[in-house]
Amino acid sequence: MTAPTVRPRLVIVDGVPMSALVAEPEPPTPPRAVIVAVHGGGTTAMYFDCPGHPSLSLLRAGAAAGFTVVALDRPGYGSSAPYPEAVALPEQRVDLAYGAVDRILGEKPRGAGVFLVGHSGGCELVMRMGADDRGADLLGIELAGTGRHYHPDAREILKAASRERRPAGLRELLWHPEELYPPEVLTGATVSPTAPAYEAQLSSTWARHDFPALAPAVAVPVRFSIAEHEKVWQTDAAAMTEIAALFSGTPEFTVHRQAGAGHNVSLGHTAADYHASVFSFVERCAGAREDG
């Protein structure tokens, strides 16, 4: 069996170029399902293809496990970065994401269906896609690196953050303990040089308003993953009880705690273990879909 290949893709959706990275099972094997991964702030789809460490790549591991994996450059990143007016509104971003997935997949088989993975700021788009009318057709959703309440230390640091300024202490929130990550990752290999303007508003409205407003509308299984060394969000039992209660419309809400991981759970030394747990959940959702 040859190692999976990751290919860049570019499609046009409503006049906006949308870029992505794609990995597929070796032909002629049809995919078990399609996993669409959405990165967080300050990075790109490269987040899901850890540079220099193919064993830590969600894209490569997913294809090897029998899934088609599409890692989107979130609207406002990658090829869509020069089109701020086309990504300013949440509904625009949802339509662009769904449109990009449809164009990338085309007539190719989708197996049991499409499953969404969101990390950090990417959870906002994934949640909006899940709460959309089209979300009822999804297999399920994986959320990681997000929450309902900021950790007290993070709250003070993030207050000073802006598109132009990275406040002191931000690196420690996102990348510590440093020994959790390969050295190459810590040099900024996955960092995006730009960020869309709409993210400034998201940082102030997501936890307080958007998350609790969207969660009840999600009607598919949800898994919520917490890194052992998460420093941005409150992850204690009380916080998780509150979050679970928000997902009143989902048939299943599961919490997964990933040992040995920091906030950037798909780039650390334990990323392969984390990704394997995601694939297991996707398989469970696919089996439930097939069983009717």
List each language-model region with its residue ranges.
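Conserved acidic catalytic loop of the alpha/beta-hydrolase fold
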Residues: 94-112
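Short beta-strand/loop motif that positions the catalytic acidic residue
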Residues: 218, 224-226
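Catalytic active-site module of serine/aspartate enzymes centered on a nucleophile-bearing elbow/loop
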Residues: 252-292
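Conserved alpha/beta-hydrolase
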Residues: 55-81
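N-terminal cap/lid segment of alpha/beta-hydrolase-fold proteins
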Residues: 1-28
